Amino acid sequence: MSNAEHLANIMVERFISAVKNGVDLVPVVADSTSTAKIAPFIKEFPDRLVNVGIAEQSLVGCAAGLALGGKVAVTCNAAPFLISRANEQVKVDVCYNNTNVKLFGLNSGASYGPLASTHHSIDDIGVMRGFGNIQIFAPSSPNECRQIIDYAINYVGPVYIRLDGKELPEIHNDDYEFVPGQIDVLRKGGKIALVAMGSTVYEIVDAAVKLAEKGIEVTVVNVPSIRPCDTEALFNAIKDCKYVISVEEHNINGGVGSLVAEVIAEHGAPITLKRRGIADGGYALAGDRKSMRKHHGIDADSIVDLALSLN
């Protein structure tokens, strides 16, 4: 894994490319220009940014209005404030009305570390899964992120994209092709499957390498497309396994662990699922990310220990 990049930088890069290629794209921020790292876009297109100030409801309402006026509206602000403060506007203005708005949840999960639960977003995927019409994605690498954003810009309809707040390493080859709904099987083998989304995918990739060094092969599944999701492909990826470990920097309810649980239950499969994430009823530990992930059992070493206990 190498060539780490910050996903917000990639987001801005794709915005600039889209406008240069004729897309009538308008970013909307809520006093979040630094969070969105959007200075390069402003330099290129100083009259194409809308800043509503610290007013997340206005952020989403304004974006919906721009979309109804024919623009490709993209909101760029921190996921915890987008999800909690603008919940009704996302539900009604964007999702119910099926407007062409792309919602970027920046610094998702526990990216803000020591700023604690006011700034953590551990329920965003669960919230968005409760709304209709909207597509939901969680990129796990720079390559995948570029492709998801390009797809979202060209797709007509609501999209939510969960972006981590730290640099992510590249885990995909140059020939990787993202397809909406797809399941990305990174490694196949053994009686244990590791399944993750977004920023924890590199943790399960790392865990798989460490397990292989101990002579244990595992299946590694990346789920970048939460909705649409090819659930049959997801089941086929794990159906021959005895155990599945889901890993996410999200509440264990509503995210990728819930998605896997639903798939296993609907198929009546004799597979034991171990969900690892932020515990039901809990909050993410405030502090540096390494300590937080170890505390919640979602770092590579904790995943290795759990897999060894099951093997």
Swiss-Prot record:
Pfam family, one: Transket_pyr
Entry-linked SUPFAM superfamilies: Thiamin diphosphate-binding fold (THDP-binding), TK C-terminal domain-like
Any GO molecular function: transferase activity
Pathway where it operates: Carbohydrate metabolism
EC category: transferase
EC number(s) from the headed UniProt entry: 2.2.1.13
UniProt keyword list: Carbohydrate metabolism, Thiamine pyrophosphate, Transferase
Chemical reaction(s) catalysed: apulose 4-phosphate + D-glyceraldehyde 3-phosphate = D-xylulose 5-phosphate + dihydroxyacetone phosphate
Cofactor(s) recorded in Swiss-Prot or TrEMBL: thiamine diphosphate
Subunit-structure text: Probable heterodimer composed of AptA and AptB.
General function of this protein: Involved in catabolism of D-apiose. Catalyzes the transfer of the glycolaldehyde group from apulose-4-phosphate to D-glyceraldehyde 3-phosphate, generating dihydroxyacetone phosphate and D-xylulose-5-phosphate.
Family in the record: Belongs to the transketolase family.
PANTHER family documented for this protein: PYRUVATE DEHYDROGENASE E1 COMPONENT, TRANSKETOLASE-LIKE PYRIMIDINE-BINDING DOMAIN-CONTAINING PROTEIN
Protein name: Apulose-4-phosphate transketolase subunit B
The encoding gene: aptB
